[in-house]
């Protein structure tokens, strides 16, 4: 199981760094910041499926 620590999120601005993560919603997030902001918005229901594109 892949785990990402989102304790420092949400952040108002994300970098443009591209390190894709695949969420449990089958959506590819461009980086940890994008994923963690979505995780916070989902009230913890979103999880990381795997590293890399979906």
Swiss-Prot record:
Domain topic, free-text comment: Avian ovomucoid consists of three homologous, tandem Kazal family inhibitory domains.
SUPFAM superfamilies listed in its UniProt record: Kazal-type serine protease inhibitors
KW Membrane (keyword) present: no
Keywords: Disulfide bond, Glycoprotein, Protease inhibitor, Repeat, Secreted, Serine protease inhibitor
Protein's name according to its UniProt entry: Ovomucoid
Glycosylation sites: 43
Residues with site note (Reactive bond 3): 16-17
Record has Disulfide bond as a keyword: yes
Primary subcellular site in the record, as a coarse category: secreted
Gene Ontology CC, one term: extracellular region
Database matches in Pfam families: Kazal_1 (PF00050)
GO molecular function: serine-type endopeptidase inhibitor activity
């Amino acid at each position: 199981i892949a785990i990402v620590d989102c304790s420092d999120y949400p952040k108002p601005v994300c970098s443009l760094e591209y390190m894709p993560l695949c969420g449990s919603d089958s959506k590819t997030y461009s980086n940890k910041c994008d994923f963690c902001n979505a995780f916070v918005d989902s009230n913890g229901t979103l999880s990381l499926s795997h590293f890399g594109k979906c």
